[in-house]
């Protein structure tokens, strides 16, 4: 069955506000099924998992279900799923627990293309424990991380490499396979942030061979919950515990505080939403995710191609980067018009976009020196008619 965008739009009552939402890189709209699930779960699962009473058992079941749902999302073992408030929080906890990998004589590699959530924790850990920091640089023409640089960056002293699988600012997709092999050859770990790619691509931690991956549920319309997943759950034991519970085991060793069980129920509902984007999808949740994400990808590729052709038709618009592989996210500048003014003009026309994402890559490319960049991204409910509205509003700036 073809992707039915009208049906998908019907799953999001908030689209009734009349706004055109091209601000997907900041998080997609919450489907009604997720909002309803969260509300119901907060009424039923308010207690912690400690105890033998029904509410505690329901909370424990919600926690288990959330780990299983995230595991299906990334093709992993539920025993390796760590849950928390946000991927930035989880990565900070992981970095805090990584003293054995960030000490004197060791090296940590981070990327200029990443969100700050996957940079700042490792910089702090390196400063605290004495490791040397190396940077994977961006090709200023394409906006990608060139694969040739990994051989010169990775050494016997490398203990950890942190990268994203796709940029939430430029949209470029990172080639992970060659890099992960080099990293593993020296006994180091690879931490991959999938937050930008998760709404658009079927994730597979085994296929990329990453050791740890992170996602943010709000990226695809889930609640504000992050997940950090270990390909091999036993690797968690090589990190120090950050839990306030001295008896914590497994994922709980890297979790702090009491879980928000209502939000965790929403994570499950949001992954079910992804698995049902294509009504024809059948089978296990992982199988339904594979079908639905493929259908969504095919649809969004058509809309994104139309968006790119339309933007290139505007003489004052300059696209930033030319990645070969791309999620449906793009940044651009408008000649002699600051990004915040462009975004305000779009808002005046009922269109939401993002001015200056805060990514270091915009500084590297010199974009912030000439007024900054506007970032737009498609969501599962985006249409070609909305692209036309965006282009008309941008054309009015000329």
Swiss-Prot record:
Disruption phenotype: Cells lacking this gene display impaired growth. Coiled coil: none annotated. GO terms for cellular component: peptidoglycan-based cell wall; plasma membrane. It comes from the Bacteria. InterPro entries: Aminotrans_V_dom, Cys_dSase-rel, PyrdxlP-dep_Trfase, PyrdxlP-dep_Trfase_major, PyrdxlP-dep_Trfase_small. Homodimer. NCBIfam families: am_tr_V_VC1184. Was identified as a high-confidence drug target. Belongs to the class-V pyridoxal-phosphate-dependent aminotransferase family. Is essential for optimal growth. This is Uncharacterized protein Rv3778c. It comes from Mycobacterium tuberculosis (strain ATCC 25618 / H37Rv). The lineage of its organism: Bacteria, Bacillati, Actinomycetota, Actinomycetes, Mycobacteriales.
């Amino acid at each position: 069955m073809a992707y039915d965008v009208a049906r998908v739009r019907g799953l999001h009552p908030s689209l009734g506000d009349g706004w055109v939402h091209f601000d997907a890189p900041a998080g997609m709209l919450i489907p009604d099924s997720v909002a309803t699930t969260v509300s119901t779960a907060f009424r039923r699962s308010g207690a912690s998992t400690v105890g033998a009473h029904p509410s505690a058992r329901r909370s424990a079941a919600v926690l288990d279900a959330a780990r299983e749902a995230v595991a299906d999302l990334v093709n992993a073992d539920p025993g390796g799923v760590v849950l928390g408030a946000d991927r930035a929080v989880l990565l900070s906890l992981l970095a805090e627990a990584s003293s054995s990998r960030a000490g004197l004589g060791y090296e940590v590699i981070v990327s200029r293309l990443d969100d700050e959530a996957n940079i700042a924790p490792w910089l702090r850990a390196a400063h605290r424990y004495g490791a040397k920091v190396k940077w994977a640089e961006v090709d200023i023409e394409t906006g990608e991380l060139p694969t040739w640089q990994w051989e010169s960056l990775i050494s016997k002293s490398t203990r950890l490499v942190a990268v994203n699988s796709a940029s939430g600012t430029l949209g470029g997709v990172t080639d992970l396979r060659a890099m992960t092999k080099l990293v593993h050859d020296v006994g180091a770990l690879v931490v991959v942030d999938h937050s930008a790619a998760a709404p658009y691509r079927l994730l597979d931690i085994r296929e990329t061979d990453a050791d740890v991956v992170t996602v943010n549920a709000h990226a695809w319309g889930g609640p504000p919950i992050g997940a950090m997943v270990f390909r091999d759950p036993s690797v968690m034991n090589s990190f120090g515990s950050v839990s306030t519970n001295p008896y914590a085991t497994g994922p709980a060793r890297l979790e702090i505080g009491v879980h928000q069980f209502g939000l965790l129920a929403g994570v499950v509902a949001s992954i079910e939403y992804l698995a049902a984007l294509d009504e024809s999808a059948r089978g296990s949740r992982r199988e339904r995710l594979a079908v639905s994400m493929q259908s969504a990808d095919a649809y969004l590729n058509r809309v994104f191609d139309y968006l790119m052709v339309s933007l290139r038709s505007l003489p004052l618009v300059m696209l930033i980067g030319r990645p070969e592989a791309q999620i449906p996210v793009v940044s651009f500048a408008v000649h002699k018009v600051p990004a915040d003014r462009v975004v305000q003009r779009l808002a005046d026309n009922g269109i939401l976009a993002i001015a200056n994402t805060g990514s270091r890559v915009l500084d590297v490319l010199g974009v912030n020196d000439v007024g900054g960049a506007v970032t737009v991204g498609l969501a599962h409910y985006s249409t070609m008619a909305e692209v036309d509205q965006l282009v008309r509003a941008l054309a009015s700036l000329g």
